[in-house]
A protein has these predicted regions:
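Nucleotide-activated sugar donor-binding and catalytic core shared by glycosyltransferases
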Residues: 2-10, 15, 20-160
């Protein structure tokens, strides 16, 4: 976070989970004065922040869906996830966000790339197709129903 504040010389809002705050305090880690710690936000407030940010850097598992959704409504934003893997490879395949890893070098490179693509107008403009599927609930019900017998027999050892 400090490296981003130094490189871009702009305020950074750090929506900090209470456990993270305690850990930072326990280690004595000092944040750059441009980094402003903030209590976790509600979903609506956080979405408004995302739409109006220079870039969004998060370890949230919902970042892929959020970046895909905002692209679909014409408000794409540079999204960078500080993780080494994702549960949403389909969003990665559609370039809705960038995985930065957890190193300072990887983070700086990912943010630079995402911001440059945004400046060029090269961020995705369409959502991940799976996320736009309006029949997903029906599909999930059918999948669960289809596997109930197999799971009962093989996992729970129920006699049918």
């Amino acid at each position: 976070i400090n490296a981003l504040a130094e490189k871009y010389d702009m305020p950074i809002l750090y929506s900090c989970h209470p456990r993270s705050r305690k850990r930072l305090e326990a280690t004595g880690f000092k944040l750059d004065p441009r980094v402003r710690m903030h209590e976790p936000m509600g979903f609506h407030d956080y979405n408004c922040l995302q739409m109006n940010s220079f870039a969004v850097v998060s370890d949230s598992g919902t970042l892929p869906e959020e970046s895909s959704f905002f692209a679909s409504v014409g408000r794409p934003f540079p999204a960078v996830c500080i993780r080494t893997s994702t549960e949403r490879p389909e969003a990665l395949d559609k370039a809705c966000f960038t995985l930065a890893g957890i190193s300072e070098r990887g983070l700086l490179q990912a943010v630079r790339t995402a911001v440059e693509l945004d400046a060029e107008g090269s961020l995705p403009e369409a959502p991940v197709p799976d996320y736009a599927d309006e029949t997903v609930s029906t599909k999930v019900v059918k999948i669960i129903q289809s596997y109930t017998g197999v799971v009962d027999k093989m996992v729970w050892r129920k006699s049918l």
